Amino acid sequence: MTPRIRLIAGVALIVFGFALFGWAIYAGLNPTAPFETRLAPISADAAKDVEGFGLTPERLQQIEVSTKDERRPLATGVVARDEAGRLTPLVWRNQVTEPIFFAEVSAADAAKVLAAIREHTPQDAVVLAWWDCSRAIRLVAGRAAPLDDAEARGLLLPAAWSAAGAAERARWGAGVPTSSANDFTRFMDALLDSDEARASEALKKLADGKPAYVAVRISDAWMLAAARPQQLSIAYKDFAATG
């Protein structure tokens, strides 16, 4: 190899190295989502499974979360949209151990809970609940559930997906007034407050003087921990099956 050819080859390698370095910086600043969320019109079979919600098929969609490395979806569900276009998860199935976005909930269980809220709360009552549950209460139970969150705080994302979390929270927070964040922050503060009297008073203020009920699910503890990890930590461990 002549000196000139060696020089050209060396320059080419340097340029190629800078190109790789530049791409690494670009990829770091513009991370590609490690998963894909797809929405599709609900099938006839899926619509039949969720008849208990009393919503027309036109308001329902099927949702699927998948990655290119897995042949089967990581999570599937049924969502509804309200007049503002907000997505409301009604049914959720996680196909992996770690919850993806939401905890598992079946159509039968969700319909039973929402029917109980409708049956046991006065029509003028205010139900305070996590933002996804609030949407379902408004849509299906027909009760005032004013809390919502444009930031969709508490969405359950695996740690490896944290870089894409903002885009996914924006999807679930779409259609929600940004002003809702203040009341939802106060709701989380009340749930974490160790002073019961002060927490109760804060919840009453959120209900604006109307009869108030608080609907809290076990899964809300997970979402609260995801939203406020510095104040609430939850750990879990898988135990091998023993025979």
What residue spans do the PLM features occupy?
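Short, Lys/Arg-rich N-terminal segment immediately upstream of the first membrane anchor
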Residues: M1-R6
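Hydrophobic membrane-insertion alpha-helices, especially the h-region
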Residues: I8-I25
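Extracytoplasmic
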Residues: F16, P31-G243
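Sec-dependent signal peptide cleavage junction
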Residues: I25-P31
